[in-house]
Amino acid sequence: MNAYLSLLEKSHTIPNFFISEEYRKKSGIIEKQDSEYVYWYMGGWVITPPINKITGETLHIFNPLFTSVWSDFPDWIMPGLTTSKFLDYEFIFDPKSFLKMEGGEWQTFRKNCKKFPRRFQKGLLSYDSIDKLYCLKGVKCIEERLKQVMIDWLDSMGPNTEIQDDDVMIKYLLHGKNRKILHDSKGYIYGVNIWDENWKYINYRFCICKKEDFLSEYMRYLFYTDSIIQAKNKLVNDGGSVGNIGLEKFKRKMNPIVVREVKSWFKME
């Protein structure tokens, strides 16, 4: 574990969706240090709040080196002559709540997540780790099928849809450490769930799936009820909506326990 992640865990600083070692490496974020602070940097931005190497406290006053922070942490506020700008939401979920999905607030998702698997005979669909499919079909074969799922998913977005972090998405799809795949008995891939984690949260990175009615709901249900996820006893940071109103509505129907506004902060001139 690198210095920044170690300090966050030691100080029990609650991280945001961008915090994991796997994401740092796959996105090209660089860890830097000065005499006082450790911080993550990429493309001219300090990505998240710098943290003091001695005290473990996050930066609380801008200085000549730190004049902006791209994405804040929960409860992190920069006082003084500063301004902030909305970046995205963060949706936090409790995986335990997906085991029962009780109450009227769950009615829509509870109904919709059952619709996709009802189209198939019992036992036809399987949800397995990527390693199992590699053993059954071979690495090259599965990687080609994963690429096709990605192509189909991108095509379903429409020509005017902006895909953020598409290069990072491909790295996770082909080389992610935590991937589980929904497939049929012939190895046809319907969707892929991809995640990583930090000391506080499991980060649900990507759901890449075919454009089939109610498949997205079923993929989320499979992820949240998976014994691997349940056994970690962690909350899940499901990321934001990247300006997509449909995605925001979709996530709100899953009854998040927290919806946080993530902001960028700037020092006023």
Predicted regions and their residues:
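Conserved donor-binding loop and adjoining core beta-sheet/short helix segment
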Residues: 1-77, 183-212
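A structural signal for short, well-ordered beta-strand segments and their strand-loop junctions
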Residues: 32, 59-71, 92, 126, ...
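Well-ordered, non-membrane alpha-helical segments in soluble/globular domains
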Residues: 52-62, 108-112, 163-167, 218-221
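Conserved acetyl-CoA-binding loop of GNAT-fold acetyltransferases
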Residues: 76-85, 252-260
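Acyltransferase donor/substrate-recognition loop-hinge adjacent to the catalytic core
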Residues: 78-159
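Short, conserved active-site entrance elements at the starts or edges of catalytic domains
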Residues: 141-188
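Aromatic (often tryptophan-rich) hydrophobic motifs at membrane interfaces
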Residues: 178-268
